[in-house]
């Protein structure tokens, strides 16, 4: 037991830390250029906060021992925690709030999947107290900027609309509606066909819903014929305007697939929902996900006052995997700029002084001192293996002999 980390967790060694740090640093730089400020919330939250008023399944939360104040757990995502903080701690600040984060999250695996990963690393943004077309477009264009800055290969955004999908599902009786919804979420056409529909009209409508994915213009033309409610027609028009805005901002078509069967894991989404995927070397990976949640903030308001919000989270592990075969990630942990070697016990003070001088002269330099026990040949072999750039041999009188490798 003591030789391995707990099931579902893993250690990150220096090269992987360097590469994922490179990804995170570039993402945070993009976030800041778009005006987002970093927020840090607690890893441990009240279970009521994490389940976001019933929107998140409590079974996905790794719960901790409760006390007299209630149950707590490890956050399975950041949106609920940031929404709580924004409503309760930042209510006096001007709106909108543009917040970003980089953090780990924890999710309990499903029954029968012991050993599955439980700790994940994410980076993302939340645009709070602002609704409408421009906010939706900002989030999607920011997401695209993130992928462009990392040179992610073959990425696409799959876009749905939670409110529109709910409207299209409304003709189905309640028990059947949930079954249809599940089949759509799992892309399970066989089960969808075999559901007990009360009439052939609903069966045909379920088939149409299943196939509402593809080129945005084509899908919007199909769904316009199905959208009977006024709210659904409004959602269709908003999607048309959003697609036009996204395409107008880029030199070529925005890499977008419209999929009205897209249903996210977290049920607090009320407007657009989306997943970002990369099809690299015939492996489809989910790089990120997000959407609009215009009711979630009200869960944390003392009077239940709702406010709009939208955001996304990026999966650092999947981004890392998608970039490994390319040329952008660092291929090694940052090497030392200088290795200082004291030549004798009486040279130790002079060596520390030389190291301090180098660090003070350039705060970005990486400087270490050889701790002894190796011959000159062994030191040079070590330096070459570690790609150390410079050696400095320090004499007892403080004189230094430098060499570049």
Swiss-Prot record:
Q: What is its main location?
A: cytoplasm
Which CDD domains does this UniProt record tie to the protein?
Answer: HisRS-like_core
SUPFAM superfamilies linked to this entry: Class II aaRS and biotin synthetases
Question: For this chain's UniProt record, which GO biological process terms are given?
Answer: histidyl-tRNA aminoacylation; L-histidine biosynthetic process
Where, per UniProt, does this protein localize? Cytoplasm
User: Is the Protease keyword given for this protein?
Assistant: no
CC annotations in GO: cytoplasm
Q: Which GO terms describe its molecular function?
A: histidine-tRNA ligase activity
The set of disulfide-linked cysteines is none
Pathway listed: Amino-acid biosynthesis; L-histidine biosynthesis; L-histidine from 5-phospho-alpha-D-ribose 1-diphosphate: step 1/9
Keywords in alphabetical order, please: Amino-acid biosynthesis, Cytoplasm, Histidine biosynthesis
Is Cytoplasm included in the keywords of this UniProt record? yes
InterPro entries associated with the record: aa-tRNA-synth_II/BPL/LPL, HisRS-like_core, HisRS/HisZ, HisZ
Q: Please give the function described in this protein's UniProt entry.
A: Required for the first step of histidine biosynthesis. May allow the feedback regulation of ATP phosphoribosyltransferase activity by histidine.
The record's comment on protein family reads: Belongs to the class-II aminoacyl-tRNA synthetase family. HisZ subfamily.
Q: How does it assemble?
A: Heteromultimer composed of HisG and HisZ subunits.
Misc. comment: This function is generally fulfilled by the C-terminal part of HisG, which is missing in some bacteria such as this one.
Q: What is this protein called?
A: ATP phosphoribosyltransferase regulatory subunit
Q: Which organism is it from?
A: Microcystis aeruginosa (strain NIES-843 / IAM M-2473)
